[in-house]
């Protein structure tokens, strides 16, 4: 693979000269964004199918064989719908808000590695970049609520901003703990460090992943990610019985679709981050045949699908929490727990039983 890429680089540079770097960057962006959009589209089908199975029904099965064309039909429906801009809205901000939401969701994928050297930009501060860029999405939500000139949209935006900022703190402390045990902000190095240790030497690589010693942090990261996404059971932002669709209530057509795409792209992103930080990324769970025959990117996809399915399971199983319960969980439970575990890990790493170094 490295030789193939080197030959492609040489041929491209000989044909295009200094423009090759720009062309190659655009090719890599398209190679990441297009499959991501496909995954987002079919994640909606997977979600509806899984919830259908949990409810003992079939789910979508009419559009195409086994309902496989349902995401395409949904996309066409949204494309053909009229984009209605409310008469009393701040029109420029109303149009910009969905773009402000989806752009960080796509930009964060620039540093996500799909293999040891397979990343759009393999930067040393990848963990910090993801945390910083995803925190910008709250601005799109606030702008959407303000620009809509609707009390429902504004109330939903205020709820969303408070909830997202609150749970970002807990997620940030979890990332600090992962940084402590890994000694690196580079996502590829974090994965590689999980493939070494006593259990990995025995071939039981899955016992050397961070999920085992950092299990409470793994659970907090998944639950905080659910709240960060404003998904069920933390979806008071768009509680249908209270404020209809929250900050998205005045949006239609592709404007609404951008919020929708941002939510599902972020769900895949948080699942991928959980896989890279806690589940060994692209490493196989057991270092023996036939597990080692499976390519690393397939293992990465399987683990990410597992975490994504957890989000869907939460939606199908739990009732919606009240807003005060959500805030209490974030500030009085998760943030103190992450701080205490941060101290425990710091002390653990100074003892002879340090398992990370």
Curated annotation (Swiss-Prot):
It catalyses: a quinone + NADH + 5 H(+)(in) = a quinol + NAD(+) + 4 H(+)(out). One of its GO terms (biological process) is aerobic respiration. Its main location: membrane. The chain crosses the membrane at residues 20-40, 92-112, 127-147, 165-185, 203-223, 259-279, 294-314, 329-349. The keyword Translocase applies. GO terms for cellular component: plasma membrane. Its EC number is 7.1.1.-. Keywords: Cell inner membrane, Cell membrane, Membrane, NAD, Quinone, Translocase, Transmembrane, Transmembrane helix, Ubiquinone. One of its GO terms (molecular function) is oxidoreductase activity, acting on NAD(P)H, quinone or similar compound as acceptor. It is a multi-pass membrane protein. It is found in: Cell inner membrane. InterPro entries: NADH_UbQ_OxRdtase_su1/FPO, NADH_UbQ_OxRdtase_su1_CS. The keyword Transmembrane helix applies. NDH-1 shuttles electrons from NADH, via FMN and iron-sulfur (Fe-S) centers, to quinones in the respiratory chain. The immediate electron acceptor for the enzyme in this species is believed to be ubiquinone. Couples the redox reaction to proton translocation (for every two electrons transferred, four hydrogen ions are translocated across the cytoplasmic membrane), and thus conserves the redox energy in a proton gradient. This subunit may bind ubiquinone. Belongs to the complex I subunit 1 family. NDH-1 is composed of 14 different subunits. Subunits NuoA, H, J, K, L, M, N constitute the membrane sector of the complex. PANTHER family: NADH DEHYDROGENASE SUBUNIT 1, NADH-UBIQUINONE OXIDOREDUCTASE CHAIN 1. This is NADH-quinone oxidoreductase subunit H. It comes from Herminiimonas arsenicoxydans. The gene is nuoH.
